[in-house]
């Protein structure tokens, strides 16, 4: 029951690009981003500090860094366009900022797919107190 409540809290207020990010993770990695990465390691979910715990957590670290480089639009809210060509997601549209958000999400979803074998349940709901080391630069 606690897990269902946490999942509901994670979904409250989610709009725009975050919904699209979830869709891309499902499409590319074949699993739910909210479920598997909504609260994982030191970087997956809200916030982020310390050292990434494994390759899956590093995907989130790189995604956070990518979002940090986006200017002139809101990576968590703005809606972008993409298409699928021969099974490959291609970011599109005329707005370079929104295209950059899409690329951040596409790269992260691909990273999750490529690192499924490193996913370790011990990092699910990982305590923030274990993420106190100095963060590495992006």
Curated annotation (Swiss-Prot):
GO CC, one annotated term:
extracellular region
Which subcellular locations apply to this protein?
Answer: Secreted
Taxonomy, superkingdom: Eukaryota
PROSITE patterns reported for this sequence: PA2_ASP, PA2_HIS
Cofactor binding mode, per the note?
A: Binds 1 Ca(2+) ion.
What cofactor does this protein call for?
Ca(2+)
Q: Which residues form a coiled coil?
A: none
- Report the Pfam families cross-referenced here: Phospholip_A2_1
Q: What is its EC number?
A: 3.1.1.4
Q: What is its main location?
A: secreted
What's the family? Belongs to the phospholipase A2 family. Group II subfamily. D49 sub-subfamily.
The name this protein goes by in its record: Acidic phospholipase A2 BE-I-PLA2
């Amino acid at each position: 029951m606690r897990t269902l409540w946490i999942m509901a809290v994670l979904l409250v207020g989610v709009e725009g690009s975050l919904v699209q990010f979830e869709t891309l993770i499902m499409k590319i990695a074949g699993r739910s981003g909210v479920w598997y990465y909504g609260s994982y390691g030191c970087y997956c979910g809200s916030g982020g500090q310390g050292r990434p715990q494994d390759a899956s957590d590093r995907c989130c670290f790189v995604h956070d860094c990518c979002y940090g480089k986006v200017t002139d639009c809101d990576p968590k809210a703005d809606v972008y366009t993409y298409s699928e060509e021969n099974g490959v997601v291609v970011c599109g549209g005329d707005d370079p900022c929104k295209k950059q958000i899409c690329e951040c999400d596409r790269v992260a979803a691909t990273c999750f797919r490529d690192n499924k074998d490193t996913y370790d349940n011990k990092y699910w709901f990982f305590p923030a107190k274990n993420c106190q080391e100095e963060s590495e630069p992006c």
